[in-house]
Amino acid sequence: MAGRVWRSLVDVGPERKLLLAGFSMGGYVALQMLAMPLRNVEGLALLCSSAHPDQPEAAPLRERAISAAARDWPRYVEKIGEFLMTAVARADPALREAILADLREAGADSTIAQMRAVMTRPDQRSMIAGLMLNALVVAGSDDPLIPIDDARAAAQAIPQARFELMPGAGHLIPWEQPQALAMLMRSWITQTLNET
């Protein structure tokens, strides 16, 4: 996937500053892009993501999730949506439906391919220690997928990183706290563009 994203940026001239931001699996893709850099990158934002590889004990759970998604996609979307949402999101009918609609739209085949890619993602912890860029690592205090310690460790490993913990947020920060996230991102983008 990282190669595909690099190819999509081929027409972006070297005079343009490049900042990468990745949410969840997108963070893994951004890290893989930095592991095989094709041009200079000035900034990185990791949102609900980490540099850790998938844990071996997660493999059986992921295989069950893959089977469930392949067998009954609508039911899988309901189950995974309930798991990922905080109680606040579940209690808001419009927000709950928006999240479920986006999950449904991803489709079973794409979601299964993403789960398989997540299972085999490389350990990027040593790579990020050598990054010389302005980084922002954002974690949700109630994220059921990404341990706070993993996200904090990524921020501590990157020399010029800032860690932001969003209280009450789960894994779905872009849906659950979009305004707060937008403010963080704007601040990071402005700072990065002004410093590089």
Regions found by a protein language model. Give the residues of each.
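Catalytic active-site module of serine/aspartate enzymes centered on a nucleophile-bearing elbow/loop
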Residues: A161-T196
